[in-house]
Structures are given as structure tokens and as C-alpha cells.
Amino acid sequence: MANHFRVDRVGMEIKREVNEILQKKVRDPRVQGVTITDVQMLGDLSMAKVYYTIMSDLASDNQKAQLGLEKATGTIKRELGHNLKMYKIPDLTFVKDQSIEYGNKIDQMLRDLDK
């Protein structure tokens, strides 16, 4: 049970650090406006699935952001290594967070019911 709390704590710390690294260290214009919404860790802390959103709804911007994040993965891992006190920094996988779009769709459906 205690391991579960550690996994959650490490995930929250990685989320905070990756957001900061994207704002201050990564200069790639493709990742401007990207916000990390969640990080899910494997139980052994070897892999982190990083969920992100981008302000634009355009598919081309989403694809550019994904490519920019994949390109910046090495820089992000290196900075995490400097900032976190962990034996091994987990491998990072970036995934577009669909929950906000889903929430907006549900919101629109509810508004349409009121009409």
C-alpha cells in the first residue's frame, strides 16, 4: 500500500517538473502552449505516461506538438535527472489528453438540451 502512495507522489512531482521544464528550458516553438495534465506511472517507476493538452484545436498543431514533445524527450529526461532525487528516471511517453475535448462535447450536448 505504501508503494502506491510513492508512485502517486513521484507522478505528481514529474508533472510539476515537466511543466516547468517545458516553460523554461525547451525552446521548440512546437511545444509552446502545451500543458501537462496528468502523469501515470508504472508500479516499478520505470515508465511514465505523460498526458498533455494544447490550446489549439487544429489537428496539424496537435501533430506538431506531439513531434516537438518526442524530440524534447531527451532534454526533459536530462533535466528531470538534475531536479529529482531518483536512481533511474522513468522513460517518458507523451499522450494527448482527450478528457477536456470529451468534457466540452458533453457540455455542448447539455446546452443543446436546454434549447
Swiss-Prot record:
Main location: cytoplasm
The protein's role, per its UniProt record: One of several proteins that assist in the late maturation steps of the functional core of the 30S ribosomal subunit. Associates with free 30S ribosomal subunits (but not with 30S subunits that are part of 70S ribosomes or polysomes). Required for efficient processing of 16S rRNA. May interact with the 5'-terminal helix region of 16S rRNA.
Keywords from the named record: Cytoplasm, Ribosome biogenesis
GO biological process terms held by the UniProt record: maturation of SSU-rRNA
Source taxon at top rank: Bacteria
Native source species: Streptococcus gordonii (strain Challis / ATCC 35105 / BCRC 15272 / CH1 / DL1 / V288)
Family, similarity comment: Belongs to the RbfA family.
A GO MF label: ribosomal small subunit binding
Entry GO terms, CC: cytosol
Pfam (any one): RBFA
UniProt name for this protein: Ribosome-binding factor A
Gene: rbfA
Species classification: Bacteria, Bacillati, Bacillota, Bacilli, Lactobacillales
Covalent S-S links between cysteines: none
Subunit architecture: Monomer. Binds 30S ribosomal subunits, but not 50S ribosomal subunits or 70S ribosomes.
Keyword field contains Cytoplasm: yes
